[in-house]
Swiss-Prot record:
Domain of life: Eukaryota
Catalytic activity: RX + glutathione = an S-substituted glutathione + a halide anion + H(+)
EC number: 2.5.1.18
Alphabetical list of InterPro entries matching this protein: Glutathione-S-Trfase_C-like, Glutathione-S-Trfase_C_sf, Glutathione_S-Trfase_N, GST_C, GST_mu, GST_superfamily, Thioredoxin-like_sf
Name used for this protein in its record: Glutathione S-transferase Mu 7
Role this protein plays: Conjugation of reduced glutathione to a wide number of exogenous and endogenous hydrophobic electrophiles.
Amino acid sequence: MPMTLGYWDIRGLAHAIRLFLEYTDSSYEEKRYTMGDAPDYDQSQWLNEKFKLGLDFPNLPYLIDGSHKITQSNAILRYLGRKHNLCGETEEERIRVDILENQLMDNRMVLARLCYNADFEKLKPGYLEQLPGMMRLYSEFLGKRPWFAGDKITFVDFIAYDVLERNQVFEAKCLDAFPNLKDFIARFEGLKKISDYMKTSRFLPRPMFTKMATWGSN
């Protein structure tokens, strides 16, 4: 029986999960919910089902895999990572995965808060000012490794790809000073399962955010 991934019909928090499901050749189907237009941003498609799915903490995204019903995007990725043994093999690798997972989510939320803020244009220069320092830390952490944990890909590379590429869309030149990060993105997109998925109609790189966002809603 295929897994079910539920989320809005946007990139959002599901991008890394979708990429991981494709990379692992998982059997899954998507339940994509559509939000209404301004000014009401009707969410009834989701709200009508929210408390009927048996989720402990009803939210989007969710993954249903048989009796396992999971919310929180990173919990979903960790579950899938364990299922496919892609969480790091040594203690050092697992520590690197844990650190980067949380660091990436911090940075993801900073960008999301900016893009949903009504004062986006006023706040954008401040974000761009600190972006090179943020990217430098990722570049130093990756070093000469092919993947962030080491020689083998882990679930955190899927989050890293999402966050780095999202920032690259936001500011096209933000990775120009960090060739190892650009190489990482090219390496990730060059994975056969990923490149094949990117050519399908299921691939959803945009919109980045919901219709309520000031930037990235189309």
